[in-house]
């Protein structure tokens, strides 16, 4: 019987360049003094995101593990999540007292989802620079994720995107499911995401 604590597992997905790694860096730095954290990153042929988070000092290096999927990033979080499951278990056993493990997917598209065996909660990240039409395009990441992040609000004036239109479309596509705008450079929206994780993830309960 496993003697270590079973942490909350949070899948973080979204297209390449949407800000997944930046979000993880911000979340880790904001939460690490309160909760015991670790991160599993996914890249196809490298461990680039692991390196970025480590060099940014998001967490101690031994708390950040990179998985090289060697193929389609969707498969590693959905159909065959064995490498990620093994990394999560190894971290859980190594530290024994983890409260939360973030699992960052490789760059994916709007149809990618996490296996329920791998993630207890899912956060999906899109960004304003992709255009104001992105929320209404739908897809499981936008409509079914437990929490949707619309990042880079500071770029809206430069790409001609209306945050009001994006908010209206997001509300229509998601119904009661929570979401927020973020500008991670300024920390805008971060507290909303943390409150969601602590509440829905029942951290400390």
Curated annotation (Swiss-Prot):
Pfam families: cobW (PF02492). Keywords: Chaperone, Cytoplasm, GTP-binding, Nickel insertion, Nucleotide-binding. The keyword Oxidoreductase does not apply. SUPFAM superfamilies: P-loop containing nucleoside triphosphate hydrolases (SSF52540). GO terms for molecular function: GTP binding; GTPase activity; nickel cation binding. It is found in: Cytoplasm. Facilitates the functional incorporation of the urease nickel metallocenter. This process requires GTP hydrolysis, probably effectuated by UreG. HAMAP family: UreG (MF_01389). Homodimer. UreD, UreF and UreG form a complex that acts as a GTP-hydrolysis-dependent molecular chaperone, activating the urease apoprotein by helping to assemble the nickel containing metallocenter of UreC. The UreE protein probably delivers the nickel. Belongs to the SIMIBI class G3E GTPase family. UreG subfamily. This is Urease accessory protein UreG.
């Amino acid at each position: 019987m496993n003697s270590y604590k079973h942490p909350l597992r949070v899948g973080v997905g979204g297209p390449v360049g949407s800000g997944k790694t930046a979000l993880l860096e911000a979340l880790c730095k904001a939460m690490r003094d309160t909760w015991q954290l670790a991160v599993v990153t996914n890249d196809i042929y490298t461990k680039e995101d692991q390196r970025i988070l480590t060099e940014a000092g998001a967490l101690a290096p031994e708390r950040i593990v990179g998985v090289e999927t060697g193929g389609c990033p969707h498969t590693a979080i959905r159909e065959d999540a064995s490498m990620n499951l093994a990394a999560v278990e190894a971290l859980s056993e190594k530290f024994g007292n983890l409260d939360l493990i973030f699992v960052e997917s490789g760059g994916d598209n709007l149809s990618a989802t996490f296996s329920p065996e791998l993630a207890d909660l899912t956060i999906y990240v899109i960004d304003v620079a992709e255009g104001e039409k992105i929320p209404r395009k739908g897809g499981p990441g936008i409509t079914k994720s437990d929490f949707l992040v619309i990042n880079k609000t500071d770029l809206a004036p430069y790409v001609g995107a209306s945050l009001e239109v994006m908010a209206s479309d997001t509300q229509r596509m998601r119904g009661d499911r929570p979401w927020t705008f973020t500008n991670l450079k300024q920390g805008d929206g971060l507290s909303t995401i943390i409150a969601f994780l602590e509440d829905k993830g029942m951290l400390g309960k």
